[in-house]
Amino acid sequence: MPKKYADRRRRAFVIALQESDAHWGALFGDDVFYDLNYSDLFTRMWLARGQAFTKTELYRFMPKVSHRTAVKYVQTAIEKGLLDETVDEQDRRRRRITMSPQLLKVIEDFLDASLQTFE
């Protein structure tokens, strides 16, 4: 089967991907977030930015980990100030989770840098 893309283009893609990954880690400044599951969580939240989620809804954003692990990931992000947790005004027994302004800026900086890397 003939190659669809030249090795030169493939190499360029791999290098850009590695640069993008390194930038993700540098932006967060904490190795705990250098994890694809956090990438899933944060980028899916960014796609739905402006919405507030229950913790259960957020666990579905990390399909490759167990519910128990997802609970820990969300709680860590809350404790580190990347996710904001507030009381649900409709049902005061529930909490709603949103992206903190800090996380929104980090994700948008990452996206801008990645787009530039891949251009």
Region spans (language model):
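Short alpha-helical segments that sit at the start of domains
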Residues: F13-F42
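Short, cationic-aromatic polyanion-contact patches
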Residues: D88-L111
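Short amphipathic alpha-helical interaction segments
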Residues: K64-E79
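Short, locally clustered residues in the helix-turn-helix/winged-helix DNA-binding domain
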Residues: T43-G50
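A short, conserved structural fragment
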Residues: I78-D88
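Amphipathic alpha-helical dimerization/coiled-coil segments
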Residues: R9, S20-W24, E108-E119
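General nucleic-acid-binding
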Residues: M1-R11
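Short acidic, hydrophobic short linear motifs in intrinsically disordered regions
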Residues: Q51-F61
